Structure formats: C-alpha cells, structure tokens
Amino acid sequence: MLAKRIIPCLDVKDGQVVKGVQFRNHEIVGDIVPLAKRYAEEGADELVFYDITASSDARVVDKSWVSRVAEVIDIPFCVAGGIKTIDDARRILEFGADKVSINSPALADPSLINRLSEKFGVQCIVIGIDSYFDKETGLYQVKQFTGNEKATLTTKWNTFDWIKEVQSRGAGEIVLNVMNQDGVRCGYDIDQLTQARAVCNVPLIASGGAGEMVHFAEVFKQADVDGALAASVFHKQIINIGELKAYLKTQQVEIRL
C-alpha cells in the first residue's frame, strides 16, 4: 500500500504566505522560503504553493520565489496560479517545481489538461477543484476565480462530473478544495470526499477543514484519500507534522516517518 501524504499548503499573495477563512479575509502568515524550509524539516511529504490571485488578476505565478524554494527543500513541490499555456508550465518546472496545478484555467479551456499531460506526462499535472456545497439546492458546484471574492464565479460543472472530465483529459492527481470547510478547522468533508473517491481513479488529495490530528486519521481511513492538505493548523503551529505522523502511525495509517 502506498504511504499517505501530508501536504502543507502555502497560499501566496503579493510575495507572502497568507491564510483566509472560506477563501476570504486573508491575513499574512510569513515569508515563503523560511516556511517551506520549516515544513520540509518537520517531515512534510510535499508542499503545494497557490498564487491565489494570479488567475483572477490574469497573470502567471511569480516565478522568482519558485527557484528560491527549490534551492532550500529536498521534497517534491507543486505550484499553481494562472498557468494557461505549455510555456507557463515549462518555466515553472524549469525553475524547480515537480508538478504544476491548474484550476481556473482548466475550467476556461479544458483542452489545456490534454495538452499539458501530453507534453509533460500525467505525473506532473495536478487539477485543483474548488467545490462548494449549496445547502439550498443540495448540489456540489465547482467555483472559478476563487482567489478574488469579487471575481468568483459558479461554473456549470457539478463537482463529481468535473472530476470525471479532468481524469478523461489526463489529470494525474486531483486536489479537492472543499470551500465550505476552508480554514474553519472542524474536520474534512468526509461525505463529499467519499463521493469523490468513488469516481476518482487517480490520487485524490483532501483539502479544507483540518483542525486536529484526529481529522487526518478520519479522512485517510473513512474517505481513503491519498493525501491530506492543510494550511492554518501548520501555519499557526497548532499541529507539528512530525508529531502528526507519529500519531497517524498509532492509528494504523500507512505513513512515512
């Protein structure tokens, strides 16, 4: 069985790491490179960096920090933010990232997934999906341009249909960002992730809701995800990654110590 992955997420805005709640009211957490280094030293399996306003600002992720991160960490990392072309992706991979993640640009042009996976291989291509559960309609909806509250759109896609679509186009991995749970630290959305797992045949990463160690054990055991992504619990030092991994081992979760 493949080891489950613990993945700190660093949302980047104006060159600094920030964190919001339900994709709003972002506060500055700190500088990119020292945080990346700290998480690598604590035992993170990989890191994900989201330049959260790149797509809504119609620009590509700022590459200057990508190479600085590559110099100081020896674990895989993934970069997202406004990647719309093969050249955008190539530059980020050349700067040292192991994977690129696309979200809003894939919704605007789904064939981008095909082109990127054919050029770089599916192992490099991660699709981020921002999923919102509408309590009134009972529907799971995919949102676009979520880095900017004023620009955010509800797309035509049902979350689970979009999961199927991106896989058919060459997604090598899917990160499901559950917007309702983001930053509130009350646990992952096990129900939605279980439904996603049923239609997802590539690695599935849970994102949104981690608040305590038991939440990680629950999402691995109940939703059978391949990785758990979290931000605020690590940024605010509520949970230490080394201690989390030791705990998961006691819960019979396959993990790299």
Swiss-Prot record:
Pathway: Amino-acid biosynthesis; L-histidine biosynthesis; L-histidine from 5-phospho-alpha-D-ribose 1-diphosphate: step 5/9. GO terms for molecular function: imidazoleglycerol-phosphate synthase activity; lyase activity. It is an enzyme of class 4 (lyase). Keywords: Amino-acid biosynthesis, Cytoplasm, Histidine biosynthesis, Lyase. Pfam families: His_biosynth (PF00977). The keyword Cytoplasm applies. PANTHER family: IMIDAZOLE GLYCEROL PHOSPHATE SYNTHASE HISHF (PTHR21235:SF2), IMIDAZOLE GLYCEROL PHOSPHATE SYNTHASE SUBUNIT HISF/H IGP SYNTHASE SUBUNIT HISF/H (PTHR21235). IGPS catalyzes the conversion of PRFAR and glutamine to IGP, AICAR and glutamate. The HisF subunit catalyzes the cyclization activity that produces IGP and AICAR from PRFAR using the ammonia provided by the HisH subunit. Heterodimer of HisH and HisF. This is Imidazole glycerol phosphate synthase subunit HisF. It comes from Psychromonas ingrahamii (strain DSM 17664 / CCUG 51855 / 37). The lineage of its organism: Bacteria, Pseudomonadati, Pseudomonadota, Gammaproteobacteria, Alteromonadales.
